[in-house]
Structure formats: structure tokens, C-alpha cells
Amino acid sequence: MEFVVQLLNKAGGSINDMSMDYRGGDIDLSPDKPRGLPFLKPLYGLPPYQYTDDVVLMIVYESEETAIREALPSELEPMPGNIVTMCFFLCPDVTGMGARDFTMPCIPARYGDYVGQFVPYLYTSTDASLACYREVQGWPAVLGQTETTEAQGRVRARVVRNGREIIHATATVSGETITSLDFLPVILYKEIPAFDGQSCDDAYFVTTTSLLTNLNFKAGSGELTFPDADDDPVARLKPIKIIQALYGTLDDLYPETIRILKNLK
């Protein structure tokens, strides 16, 4: 930046008094119309996003209250039961972002009287989804690969990050088909740090809902471990009791609704 200022000063101008009496580039920018970056080929499209034929494994379990509170901001209170749902998604067809896979723990919590589920960590497999999750939606995403296989009702899933298997799950499902699920609204914290590192350009809690269709699930039992998590904080959410496993497919329009819960600015 100092070098740029020196060049401007040598040319007889400064950053503060530069006028706009020149043609400029061909790209028009406006805060009312996001362009996406990089300009000529944005990494991802703008929402909403249609997910089609998602393959999903959910392990519902009870965890330690202390571990759950470690993962929650002070504005949120965990719901009774100390429930966590670990969700493994394979997404072969997603508008705007392309095929990918991701895994996230969802913690039922309330903001005042509003009940939703907070997502403290998320592992996604592509650079496009990583950037979109963090920049647009506020999901706390890092890179990680989700693998899921199923044969005759036996399901296996795992998450690999930096060559380490940090999450491993198995499930056995059978019985009647489940065509509807009570999926709580998601609560996210979106933060954009300021360039000086001393404050935030934006910081707020937002809640979103999904339009889930074409659900086809079966229920059963499961197991969940963190084999080689090292210092990854997701491993703090260890299960003390498995409640249920769900496995199946769905379509998802996201987001269906958006609402700001609290602006911290």
C-alpha cells in the first residue's frame, strides 16, 4: 500500500483527492447487487440453492452439557436433554455451488423464546462451498471430506481432514419409510472481521429454514466416534448415549426463509 501511495504522489495525486473523471473498468459494482468474486468467473452462485437427491445419515445422541456449552455463544441456551445431531450429507446436485459433501453437528438451542439448532462446526469438500458457506451464509466451514456407503441397511460414514479420520459413524436402519422430519430452523453467527483486526465489519445472529421435500428415510441404531481428531474441537461433542440413527434421501431448497435474530454491531 505504501508503494502505491508513493506512485500516486509522484504522479501528482493522492488517494484522498482522486476524482472519477476517467472511464474506469467495465465492471459496475453496487452494494445492492452482489457480483461475486472473482469478477469474470465467480466461485459460486447466489442463493437460494436447490439440493437434489441428497444422501443423508443423521446420528442423534446425548452429549455432556459442559461440552455443548463450550460450543455455544452466550446468547444461546441449550435445550433440555443435551442433544446433538451429527449430520453427514452427500450432495450430488446443487445449484450455484456444484456437487459436494459436508458434515455438521447440530445443537438444539434457544435464543430467548426462539428455538432452533446451532451449528458450531462444518466440514465441506470444495473451495466453492467453503467460500459460499463462510462469505454468504455464515456457516463455520473448513475443508474436509465426507464419505458415506450403504449396503443392505448397514451404513458407514466418516470425515477426513488433513489426512486424519476425525469422525466415524456406523448405523443399521430398517423398517417403515419415514417421509417427514421435524428439522429445527438453523441458527448461525455471521461475522466479517475488519481489516485492522480490531473490530468487525459485520456481526449478527441469523436464523434460516429449509424447504425439505421427497424425504425417504429409515430409522435404526448407530455409533459415533472421533478416531483421530487430535485438537479438532468437534471431538469435544462426544456421545454418552446414542438415541437414534436416520438414513435416507431428500431434496432441499435453502434458504426458504431468513431472519436476523440479533445484530451485534
Regions found by a protein language model. Name each.
Residues 91-172:
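Aromatic- and glycine-enriched beta-alpha-beta binding-site module
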Residues 65, 73, 126-128, 229-240:
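Short, structured coil/loop segments at alpha-helix boundaries
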Residues 42-87:
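N-terminal ordered "arm"
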Residues 32-33, 42-46, 51-53, 90-93, ...:
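Short secondary-structure boundary micro-motifs
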